[in-house]
Amino acid sequence: MSVHIEAKQGEIAESILLPGDPLRAKYIAETFLEDVTCYNNVRGMLGFTGTYKGKRVSVQGTGMGVPSISIYVNELIQSYGVKNLIRVGTCGAIQKDVKVRDVIIAMTACTDSNINRLTFPGFDFAPAANFDLLKKAYDAGTEKGLHIRVGNVLTADVFYRESMDMVKKLGDYGVLAVEMETTALYTLAAKYGVNALSVLTVSDHIFTGEETTAEERQTTFNEMIEIALEAAIQQ
């Protein structure tokens, strides 16, 4: 057991999907996995292990934002030996040519969080995805005929911003979308020498106001999960 995860040793697979919402973790386990067991319910942050195409995979809710995902990623790696961590979630598009329902694979993540400045004072550490996971996820998506974008995303500490000026400037520098967790995931993966990736569905556009319907969001979410699972079982 760790502080926030009550699983016993061996109950969590080496490859894991990380949605922010614990109810999404439950949905993924019930919809895509077989022989499912629930290993965690501490603070309602559900975690499950099952099999996908005969291979063990776990799925763990992380909550929203850098501090929350950092807790779960630290414990999954240090206490349970997880080797491959794939965040699955939503993001808001910044670029004009990024459309709702597109799938974004984050090659790296810039951030307005000070998390890495605590480790590297006065220095900007640039965390990156694991290339093998990225390539496998990209190939799985293109084989499905999906519109996959690969590039930089913004990991933001603030959901309700007073000004979008900085987000617009980041868009000028090619940042594709905004979310709230990837920088932390990639930094911790680098620290502990494990593999990490973020696969994101565009649920809305920050500047045009376009949004997906609930039905569209669910369909695209399912495709994103299948991409992540295919990458996870090949690693």
Curated annotation (Swiss-Prot):
Keywords: Glycosyltransferase, Transferase. It comes from the Bacteria. InterPro entries: DeoD-type, Nucleoside_phosphorylase_CS, Nucleoside_phosphorylase_d, Nucleoside_phosphorylase_sf. It comes from Bacillus cytotoxicus (strain DSM 22905 / CIP 110041 / 391-98 / NVH 391-98). The active site is at D204. Homohexamer; trimer of homodimers. It catalyses: a purine D-ribonucleoside + phosphate = a purine nucleobase + alpha-D-ribose 1-phosphate; a purine 2'-deoxy-D-ribonucleoside + phosphate = a purine nucleobase + 2-deoxy-alpha-D-ribose 1-phosphate. This is Purine nucleoside phosphorylase DeoD-type. CDD domains: PNP_EcPNPI-like. Its EC number is 2.4.2.1. A purine D-ribonucleoside binds at H4, E162, E179, M180, E181, S203, D204. Catalyzes the reversible phosphorolytic breakdown of the N-glycosidic bond in the beta-(deoxy)ribonucleoside molecules, with the formation of the corresponding free purine bases and pentose-1-phosphate. Phosphate binds at G20, R24, R43, R87, V88, G89, T90. Pfam families: PNP_UDP_1. GO terms for molecular function: purine-nucleoside phosphorylase activity. Belongs to the PNP/UDP phosphorylase family. The record marks R217 as: Important for catalytic activity. One of its GO terms (biological process) is purine nucleoside catabolic process. One of its GO terms (cellular component) is cytosol.
